[in-house]
């Protein structure tokens, strides 16, 4: 088992937890002192109160919790947040209220999930031509699916 080093930036912060033994993402918690209401179309930067060390060669991805998006219309404004392995600041979740109703966050509420994944960092080479494929430049429905 791997271990991620976590630093509490606030005494009320909660460390990430997994909802089940096989969960891919660990829940991130709102480190707020009182309820916060996010109006429709509004963005709120949710502090988690933690900083952590993503292993070198990996990235931490911040995804919406399915229940937050499906039931309440709250999801990360940038769709997926990327935490690089050399970042040591507080993890914050930029939530956007996509619904037409105000949504209230409670202190300690689970607001996102955090997935650690390996990353490649290839070199980019400029070329005159790319290799041929059956698909070519077809996209956005070109495969008939």
PLM regions: where:
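DUTPase catalytic domain/fold
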Residues: 1-145
